[in-house]
């Protein structure tokens, strides 16, 4: 599949979720050509949107029987690089502007198709059975907190947003000394759930789907 022919791009983040397309690709052509069975729509999406995308996808498939959605979830940075290298994707859902801008600069998005969709928030979480009391982000400086799970800031948007928060609070260097970096937001969530990290920074939507964190 030639990704330069067709790519629908969605952008989500602590700021907002944006949508866009790259015109006329393989899946679009397949939809114009009668064939047996449903057309596969390949969706590359940020791991933070796993649950939301599957729920939306199920509703879409219910109303569009000719389409079957195939998902590829991962960090936005890794997905961006895969698309740039020609990886198959019809839909891209990123968790930050940075990755979408990079694709735009390389002419992988169709002109005028990016649309802001929604807002998400980053939150500080601990395991449900944790005895730590962390009422705000500054509380991570508590000596009892020795490991803070964060997304890897170069390729994981939630990690970028986390660094922005701690930078504004003037405590980024102290946080880095305690940080352990996950390859995507779901790894950050998992480490916090299991207690491998004392706390973590994830999207509010990730915290909401877990009954193992607070």
Residues covered by each model-derived region:
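Bacterial N-terminal signal peptides that target proteins for export
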Residues: 1-10
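C-terminal motif of bacterial Sec signal peptides marking the signal peptidase cleavage site
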Residues: 15-20
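Exported/periplasmic ABC-transporter solute-binding proteins
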Residues: 21-62, 77, 81-85, 96-97, ...
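Periplasmic-binding protein-like
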Residues: 90-94
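A short, gly/pro- and small-residue-rich
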Residues: 106-113
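Short, glycine-/small- and polar/acidic-enriched structural segments
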Residues: 114-122
């Amino acid at each position: 599949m030639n990704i330069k022919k067709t790519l629908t791009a969605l952008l989500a983040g602590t700021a907002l979720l944006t949508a866009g397309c790259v015109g006329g690709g393989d899946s679009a052509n397949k939809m114009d050509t009668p064939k047996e069975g449903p057309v596969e729509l390949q969706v590359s999406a940020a791991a933070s949107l796993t649950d939301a995308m599957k729920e939306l996808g199920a509703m879409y498939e219910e109303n569009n029987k000719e389409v079957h959605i195939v998902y590829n979830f991962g960090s936005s940075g890794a997905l961006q690089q895969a698309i740039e290298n020609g990886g198959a994707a019809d839909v891209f859902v990123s968790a930050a502007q940075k990755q979408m801008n990079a694709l735009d600069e390389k002419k992988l998005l169709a002109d005028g198709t990016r649309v802001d969709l929604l807002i998400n928030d980053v939150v500080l979480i601990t395991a449900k059975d944790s005895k730590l009391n962390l009422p705000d982000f500054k509380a991570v400086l508590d000596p009892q907190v020795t490991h803070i799970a964060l997304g890897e800031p170069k390729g994981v948007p939630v990690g970028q947003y986390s660094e922005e928060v701690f930078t504004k609070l003037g405590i980024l260097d102290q946080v880095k000394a305690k940080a352990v970096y996950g390859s995507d937001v779901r790894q950050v969530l998992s480490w916090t759930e299991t207690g491998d990290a004392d706390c973590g920074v994830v999207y509010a939507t990730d915290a909401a789907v877990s009954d193992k964190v607070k």
